Amino acid sequence: AIINMGQKDLLIDCQGNWGDVRTGDGAAAPRYIEARLNKFALNIAFNKQTTLWQKSYDGRKNEPTTLPLKFPLLLAHGVEGIAVGLSTKIMPHNFIDLIKGSIKILEGKNATIFPDFQTGGQVDVSDYQDGRRGGRIKIRATIMEKSKNTIAIKDVPYGVTTGSLIDSIL
């Protein structure tokens, strides 16, 4: 989980080889990487006005009971999970779009946001359904033919690595 969060470059200051979502390269072993929350994460998660604290199990330290964030982190990072009788997949959204959408909602206006992907690609959101059950999105690559023997791939679809794309072409 921490590798996934660190690769998104939003909450974690990363040190070491964290891998690359574009190429599919894995991260180094945990003993070779370091992580700490960045200033943004500390501000949105550990805010004195929104975070409730309780004593730890041995009473020596305080720990948060919950982390009510001041930012829609699930939408920014995206998440996928299953449980008994249900499943979900929330695609990642653009940071700036989320800030602008949050401001609109706080102003009492409607906001429309769509998924945005770190690796690029085109997305068809005609059946997105604003998060309601059954919505779908289609993700496509941008491929241009430069010559008879050469193609240029401008964007790679979300979830596809350059390594797996090369393997599928060869």
In which residue ranges do the predicted regions lie?
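Catalytic phosphate-handling regions of large nucleic-acid enzymes and associated NTPases
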Residues: 1-134
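Gly/Lys-enriched N-terminal cap/neck module of very large, oligomeric protein machines
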Residues: 136-170
